[in-house]
Amino acid sequence: MTTTRRLSLAYLALTAGVAVLFALNLFWGSVSLTPGAVAAALLGRGEDVLAVGIVLQLRLPRAVMVVLLGAALSAAGYLLQTFFANPIAGPFVMGVSSGAKLAVALTMVVFLQQGLLTGSATLIIAAFAGSMAAMAFVLVVARRVPRMSILVICGIMIGYICSAVTDIVVTFAQDSNIVNLHNWSMGSFSGMTWANVGAAACVVLPALAAAFLLSKPMAAYQMGESYAKSVGVPVRAFSTALVLLSSLLAACVTAFAGPISFVGIAVPHLVKNLLGSAKPLYVLPGCCLGGAAFCLLCDLIARSLFAPTELSISSVTAVFGAPVVIWLLVRRQTQEGRE
């Protein structure tokens, strides 16, 4: 099979997967709806007020948000893997998501205890500040630690520290307005509104576009810093852009849905295997589609498996994502043993 044909079929499969899973997310849930009822609601012809409300105000904005944030999380993972040259680097593993989680939790508690509301912009700014703080610590450690495995362990430890402090904050937050804080801290797409969708789109879409524009220098950077410099890539500025974009994308996800594990690690590798190519120009769009499809599937399971009880999204992503990480580690160790 030629490369072009394989890429075309892979993109077609990913796009079809997103479309099918998006539709299923509108049909299934604690209240199942027929395709006709969903279509009528989308076309403005629905006569069942309850069905129209469920589709247009609950499931549709949630599904759109899952697509946006799934794409953002997968792309963030790919950018971090490129920056650290490590296949298991990701927002959750490197502590970036946990830093954002802590900052958002503190912001929500402080604002709500003062009787103030937290808008989307406030949450995104807080999450970005937290993610950058965690990333800064990881970068400081990276200068002192030559082995990437130790750096990953440090990132995991940062995540544990931030998660522990967040759990303490959530435990002692005695305010009736922050009932959903615990669910958010576990990872959840519930409660998404069209205002949330608009705010997330204003951050995610430009960031993804900027990442795509960096595809060519990214390919050179993956060959090594020396090679990148030899072909004219401003390595320092490029590295800074990778850090900022990955942190911003991960922060936006955490601000709205809480920390979501393993998506940023697993999806880029699954996409590269599906595409049969490691070129960023091909992998980045594939990551966006793959991340959207993966999160749509996991959210559908989280909502429907034990309906009306909803599982945390991280619980489901971990079930599917963790085996991929184990497979990566085993394959890498096997390859090193052969060499």
Model-identified regions with their sequence ranges:
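Alpha-helical transmembrane segments in inner-membrane proteins
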Residues: 1-339
